[in-house]
């Protein structure tokens, strides 16, 4: 299976709620970086940190959170996914949609680095009851 096929499979698994399959692509030493301004901003080291710091929170704090890619750029060991986030933040009951870019770096068929790019203001509007949605 190519690196591109592996990353496509990650998004398919995430959409189905199959988090163990998402974690399986990760190297034990993965660096996973969430964008500054995103609710879970920072760099997480290792699959367990990603599970606890990102995925478990997405599952408990959001209704219908989705990350749907619409385009991939295949650079061999570097795969870029372009897509759209959507979801409703439970605490405010506010929804959002925002375009994302995810940059994946793979080594020996495992993801060693993930970097998220997103317009975090669109996300913050869902988190903050006082901020208007566009």
Regions found by a protein language model. Give the residues of each.
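A solvent-exposed, acidic/Ser-Thr-rich amphipathic alpha-helical stretch
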Residues: 23, 27-77
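Short, low-complexity N-terminal intrinsically disordered segments enriched in polar/charged residues
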Residues: 1-28, 128-134
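A beta-strand edge to alpha-helix "cap/lid" segment located at domain peripheries
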Residues: 55-134
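Hydrophobic pocket/interface hotspot
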Residues: 7-10, 22-26, 30, 46, ...
């Amino acid at each position: 299976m190519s690196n591109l096929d592996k990353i496509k499979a990650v998004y398919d698994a995430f959409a189905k709620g199959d988090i163990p399959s998402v974690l399986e692509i990760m190297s034990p030493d993965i660096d996973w970086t969430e964008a500054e301004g995103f609710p879970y901003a920072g760099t997480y080291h290792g699959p367990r940190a990603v599970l606890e710091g990102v995925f478990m929170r997405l599952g408990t704090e959001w209704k219908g959170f989705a990350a749907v890619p619409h385009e991939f750029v295949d650079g061999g060991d570097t795969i870029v996914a372009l897509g759209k986030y959507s979801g409703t933040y439970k605490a405010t009951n506010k929804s959002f949609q925002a375009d994302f870019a995810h940059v994946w770096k793979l080594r020996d068929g495992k993801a060693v680095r993930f970097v998220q790019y997103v317009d975090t203001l669109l996300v913050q509007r869902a988190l903050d009851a006082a901020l208007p949605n566009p």
